[in-house]
């Protein structure tokens, strides 16, 4: 099998041993646990750390335990040789890891998850570099939507499996939520313009939207850090700024 890493990664001493266990269990494509080398450098690296810790537990582990498919996540993963041999690594979007995962899901092939195969990835310190990186990811995700919505829809109709449906939800799920948010904000504005709402009412409605937007990500992050035994005290500044990190991603999606 091949194991894929970024050049700046630090690989846990037991990574290959734990991946080999998965290989011996019949898994052919397995994502390892993506941890962070520099989570406490500043609020940006802390944001990345919390994001990946959340993905590890709430996306990859949760889906794997439910019999669904995790996703390849850029680095720290294994692909068995006979998966690559027939046609090589054939992708055409900027998020080739997600694309490769979706192609496997369309074929009904479940990806594996190895929580004890750990790789430590370094994150950018500057906001400008982070903005460029996440813009690239967003463009790649949009490319995947254009390229794989139809094949996934066909797979859902033909195979009628929850794994195919989950893959379709992954690439399309954020769109309805985004549209719903815009609709709700628009309704509030129209009611205000039509004098059906006072300025105080408008302010209170905005607060109702914004407070959960700030509190829930922090609360969720703290719960995940507690479950994964991550040190919370050195991450307090990053936790406080985490909603801003996620909010900047929303601006990137608008771009």
Per-segment meaning from a language model:
Residues 170-255:
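Membrane-embedded multi-pass helical conduit in multi-pass membrane proteins
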Residues 2:
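Short aromatic/hydrophobic "clamp" motif used to bind/position activated sugar donors
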Residues 5-22:
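Acidic donor-binding/catalytic loop of UDP-sugar-dependent glycosyltransferases
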Residues 18-92, 135, 142-146:
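Long helical/loop segments within the catalytic core of UDP-sugar-dependent glycosyltransferases
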Residues 94-100:
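Acidic donor-binding loop at a coil-to-helix junction in glycosyltransferase catalytic cores
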Residues 115-129:
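Active-site donor/metal-binding and catalytic loop motifs
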Residues 52-57, 132-152, 216-220, 251-255:
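Catalytic core of nucleotide-sugar-dependent glycosyltransferases
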